C-alpha cells in the first residue's frame, strides 16, 4: 500500500492538523515507511505462538465487587470549610 499526496492532505484534514504544501512530501515518505513496517510485521510466522498481553508474566489481582462507602467520609469532608452530615456546604449563588 502506498500513500499519495492527496491522502496525506485528507488525513491532515481529518485530524485537523495544519500541513503546508512543503511538508506533504516529507509526511508522505513517513507514512509510507510506517506502512512498509506494518507490512513486514504481517509476514512474520506466528503459528503456534500464544498471544500475550505483557512482556512479563503476571496475573491480574482480583477482588470481590462489593459496594461500600469507602470508610473515609470523615477524611473527605475534613478539608471543607463547612459541612453537614458528610455533605459540603457552599454559599447560595442562585435565588
UniProtKB/Swiss-Prot annotation:
Catalytic activity: L-glutamyl-tRNA(Gln) + L-glutamine + ATP + H2O = L-glutaminyl-tRNA(Gln) + L-glutamate + ADP + phosphate + H(+); L-aspartyl-tRNA(Asn) + L-glutamine + ATP + H2O = L-asparaginyl-tRNA(Asn) + L-glutamate + ADP + phosphate + 2 H(+)
Keywords carried by this UniProt record: ATP-binding, Ligase, Nucleotide-binding, Protein biosynthesis
Gene Ontology MF term list: asparaginyl-tRNA synthase (glutamine-hydrolyzing) activity; ATP binding; glutaminyl-tRNA synthase (glutamine-hydrolyzing) activity
Presence of the UniProt keyword Transmembrane helix in the record: no
Enzyme nomenclature, EC number: 6.3.5.-
Enzyme class name: ligase
Pfam families: GatC
GO biological process, one term: regulation of translational fidelity
Assembly description: Heterotrimer of A, B and C subunits.
Stated role: Allows the formation of correctly charged Asn-tRNA(Asn) or Gln-tRNA(Gln) through the transamidation of misacylated Asp-tRNA(Asn) or Glu-tRNA(Gln) in organisms which lack either or both of asparaginyl-tRNA or glutaminyl-tRNA synthetases. The reaction takes place in the presence of glutamine and ATP through an activated phospho-Asp-tRNA(Asn) or phospho-Glu-tRNA(Gln).
Protein family per UniProt: Belongs to the GatC family.
Protein name per its UniProtKB record: Aspartyl/glutamyl-tRNA(Asn/Gln) amidotransferase subunit C
Organism name: Rhodopseudomonas palustris (strain TIE-1)
Gene name of the encoded protein: gatC
Amino acid at each position: 500500500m502506498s500513500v499519495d499526496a492527496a491522502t496525506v492532505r485528507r488525513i491532515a484534514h481529518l485530524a485537523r492538523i495544519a500541513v503546508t504544501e512543503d511538508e506533504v512530501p516529507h509526511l508522505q515518505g513517513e507514512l509510507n515507511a510506517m506502512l512498509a513496517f506494518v507490512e513486514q510485521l504481517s509476514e512474520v510466522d506466528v503459528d503456534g505462538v500464544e498471544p500475550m498481553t505483557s512482556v512479563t508474566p503476571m496475573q491480574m489481582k482480583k477482588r470481590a465487587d462489593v459496594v461500600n462507602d469507602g470508610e473515609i467520609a470523615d477524611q473527605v469532608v475534613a478539608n471543607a470549610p463547612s459541612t453537614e452530615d458528610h455533605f459540603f456546604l457552599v454559599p447560595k449563588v442562585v435565588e
